[in-house]
Amino acid sequence: MTRFWIGVVSKEHVLRGVEGGFCQVCHGKKAPLNRMKKGDYLLYYSPKYQMNDQEKLQAFTAVGKILDDTAYQVEMFEDFFPFRRDVSYYQPVKDCPIEQIRQHPQWRQYASQLRYGHFEVSKDFFLYVFDQMKVDRSRNN
């Protein structure tokens, strides 16, 4: 059964993932990535442009489909070895400001979970956000 997820990541880091064809959540932890399976979908929500910046973005910034079954580890820096999953991202997409999503009936349920960094959402909510990003859903299915 296909599941739908949100990952909370700065836009700067989202763009690295889109460019490299991977996802990484919760500062590179393996456990959240292992909850996703091949064929699942991931929406990225970016509260900020850069992780340590104060400037807010508060928008959904990328959407993709998980391509593999297992997380793998990479060396980003000498002492940082995060886990990743391979993703096929839908492109082009445009950022979807959170204001456009707040009217969805399930928004309140999910808004409080953003602080966890990675969580499952309903197909209905996923498709609602997806449509707001004006993505051609026929690609990558």
Swiss-Prot record:
InterPro entries: EVE_domain, PUA-like_sf, UPF0310. It comes from the Bacteria. Transmembrane segments: none annotated. It holds the Pfam family EVE. Belongs to the UPF0310 family. This is UPF0310 protein SGO_1818. It comes from Streptococcus gordonii (strain Challis / ATCC 35105 / BCRC 15272 / CH1 / DL1 / V288).
